[in-house]
Curated annotation (Swiss-Prot):
Its main location: cytoplasm. Belongs to the SCHIP1 family. Residues 92-106, 344-354 have a biased composition (Acidic residues). Preferentially expressed in brain, skeletal muscles and heart. Also expressed in detected in pancreas, kidney, liver, lung, and placenta. GO terms for molecular function: identical protein binding. It comes from Homo sapiens (Human). This is Schwannomin-interacting protein 1. GO terms for biological process: positive regulation of hippo signaling. Residues 242-255, 324-335 have a biased composition (Polar residues). The keyword Phosphoprotein applies.
Length: 487
């Protein structure tokens, strides 16, 4: 065993006196050396705590006999030290925990980290001042140097058995005053949960003893799948809106193109390009079928005949609506009929037996297109000639000082200044002249409409004949083509 000289301080609970006794432990049997004042101890050389023996009521430990009694009591005590140590720690645990919490609260308020003190070397002197129940008492423990001779043995630093009692380092056994808590090892930067200003959260404490920096809460996770689905839905809606807008623009452009195609077909007579089926069904330009056109033509003819015989005013109103729509078509129909008659006579005179069916069809279609293209400018020229051939109004003779009146009457427009310069009689003459012109124009319009209906009927009949001839020619051509390979 290791030899060490220690001073044991014995506290007297009744009188407040203490006595010191020196003893040495050398690991030898005390029975063999009864006269000696040495005692056996298991305190290690690294333990720097004060060994306190329980005080007796009327005796002090200064006599050698008292030392022998303590040593014998220590040797007779056979209870295992770890079990006894556990019991004592359990006794002191509630008070120690309360004191530890108070000390930790003070350290938290001061804002520095309570680091554990480094291990003391053998020979260091530590002083602890404790306040007892009756007044301030101090206990000083000095680590004696190891004994040079004797058995050296390293003991547990917490093995404090002397006389059957476990003595906590730095505590008098009989004092019931405030006790200093035994500091337990704590994890680095750790604190009791729910204590201090940063309770409920993680507090990072810098190693240099700075203030506690609370850790920021973690960012909540993002639901990327839901976000991607939402963005895809928005893109799909935008694409639908774009498609709808493009469809609208396409429909408007298609309507415009259809109008242009209708105008071109009306001008160039593209019904020959559409094939023979167009003559019995509605064309792309919206032209009605042949049977409906024939029936409407007969109804129009009867309607105009009845209206012309019954009421002239209604004829005048109808003429105003029909002039803007149908009058330009009458010379065109006349011209087209004349060209068609001339073409039929030329076809009858020529010998077409040598020509192929397809070539003859293409030739006839080209001639029809040329005739229809020339019809519109020729109709305009004819209208201008008719205007020049008209007689001047008799109002020009009544108003010699106003030569421009006749021209204004021909254009059917008079200025307010001219009307203010005229007398009532002159204005009455102009009104009567205008009524007479209206009647004559209505009669002329009725005649032209009748002619137009007749020409439409002839045109429909000719188209039916052309369709029949085309079908017959196609069948003949197929029959001839079938016979040629057979031969």
């Amino acid at each position: 065993m290791e030899r060490s000289g220690q001073r044991v301080t014995t506290w007297d609970c009744d009188q407040g006196k203490h006595s010191d006794s020196d003893y040495r432990e050398d690991g030898m049997d005390l029975g063999s050396d009864a006269g000696s004042s040495s005692s056996s101890s298991r305190a290690s050389s690294q333990s720097n705590s004060t060994k306190v023996t329980p005080c007796s009521e009327c005796k002090s430990s200064s006599s050698p006999g008292g030392s022998l009694d303590l040593v014998s009591a220590l040797e007779d005590y056979e209870e295992p030290f770890p079990v006894y140590q556990k019991k004592v720690i359990d006794e002191w645990a509630p008070e120690e925990d309360g004191e530890e919490e108070e000390e930790e609260d003070e350290r938290d308020q001061r804002g520095y980290r309570d680091d554990r003190s480094p291990a003391r070397e053998p020979g260091d002197v530590s002083a602890r001042t404790r306040s007892g129940g009756g007044g301030g008492r101090s206990a000083t423990t000095a680590m004696p140097p190891p004994v040079p001779n004797g058995n050296l043995h390293q003991h547990d630093p917490q093995d404090l058995r002397h006389n059957g009692n476990v003595v906590v380092a730095g505590r008098p056994s009989c004092s019931r005053g405030p006790r200093r808590a035994i500091q337990k090892p704590q994890p680095a930067g750790g604190r009791r949960s729910g204590r201090g200003p940063a309770a409920g959260g993680l507090c990072l404490q810098p190693p240099d003893g700075g203030t506690c920096v609370p850790e920021e809460p973690p960012v909540p996770p993002m639901d990327w799948e839901a976000l991607e689905k939402h963005l895809a839905g928005l893109q799909f809606r935008e694409q639908e809106v774009r498609n709808q807008g493009q469809a609208r623009t396409n429909s408007t452009s298609a309507q415009k193109n259809e109008r242009e195609s209708i105008r071109q077909k009306l001008a160039l007579g593209s019904f020959f390009d559409d094939g023979p089926g167009i003559y019995t069904s509605c064309s792309k330009s919206g032209k009605p079928s042949l049977s409906s056109r024939l029936q409407s033509g007969m109804n129009l003819q009867i309607c105009f005949v009845n209206d012309s015989g019954s009421d002239k005013d209604s004829d005048a109103d109808d003429s105003k609506t029909e002039t803007s729509l149908d009058t330009p078509l009458s010379p065109m129909s006349k011209q087209s009929s004349s060209y068609s008659d001339r073409d039929t006579t030329e076809e009858e005179s020529e010998s077409l037996d040598d020509m192929d069916f397809l070539t003859r069809q293409k030739k006839l279609q080209a001639e029809a297109k040329m005739a229809l293209a020339m019809a519109k400018p020729m109709a305009k020229m004819q209208v201008e000639v008719e205007k020049q051939n008209r007689k001047k109004s008799p109002v020009a003779d009544l108003l010699p000082h106003m030569p421009h009146i006749s021209e204004c009457l021909m254009k059917r427009s008079l200025k307010p200044t001219d009307l203010r310069d005229m007398t009532i009689g002159q204005l009455q003459v102009i009104v009567n002249d205008l009524h007479s012109q209206i009647e004559s124009l209505n009669e002329e319009l009725v005649q032209l409409l009748l002619i137009r209906d007749e020409l439409h009927t002839e045109q429909d009949a000719m188209l039916v004949d052309i369709e029949d001839l085309t079908r017959h020619a196609e069948s003949q051509q197929k029959h001839m083509a079938e016979k040629m390979p057979a031969k």
